[in-house]
A protein has these predicted regions:
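Conserved beta-strand/loop scaffold segments within soluble protein domains that form the structured core
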Residues: 1-104, 108-111, 125, 132-153
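Short, conserved phosphate-binding/catalytic loop or strand-edge motifs used
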Residues: 122
Length: 153
């Protein structure tokens, strides 16, 4: 399960997901990434529910966010609800800003600041699309996302 969300101005975005593992040897990999700017707000509330019969389940849940302004807000709550005792499950959330050292590195090589930021955001979002087998569709989708990335401060 993969997702990308972009919010700017005063947009509000809510994501609520539930993944149910009910039988043995289940697997899931949930990755949601967001880019927020302006006074936008986003909510990620994801739950992985591993039932007692779902032994040997392998589940990963991650919510990662870039804040491009001081006024953008993210509320993130990844959850694991596990009733089996032989599982491998992880969850986590990150909230951060663009890597200033990375931007400096690119600018030192003659790339304009805005282009350096877009390159870094493209790489950031690209991870979400990595599982797509159709490379043309993947590139088209990535370009559409890049066109709609909100402007930072």
């Amino acid at each position: 399960l993969r997702g990308v969300y972009l919010a700017d101005q005063k947009n509000h975005i809510d994501h609520h997901t539930i993944i149910e593992h009910e039988d043995e040897h289940c697997t899931s990999n949930e990755l949601y990434k967001g880019i927020l700017s302006g006074k936008s707000t986003a909510v990620f509330n994801g739950r992985i529910h591993v039932h007692k019969a779902a032994q040997k389940t392998d589940a990963i849940q991650s919510n990662q966010n870039l804040l491009l302004s001081d006024d953008a807000i993210i509320h993130t709550k990844p959850e694991l609800e596990i009733y089996a005792d032989d599982v491998k499950c992880t969850h986590g959330a990150t909230i951060g800003r663009l890597d200033e050292k990375g931007i400096f590195y690119l600018r030192a090589r003659g790339i304009k600041k805005e282009e350096a930021q877009k390159m870094m955001m493209r790489a950031y979002i690209g991870e979400v699309l990595n599982g797509m087998k159709n490379s043309k569709a993947k590139e088209t989708l990535l370009e559409k996302i890049i066109e709609n990335i909100p402007e930072g401060e």
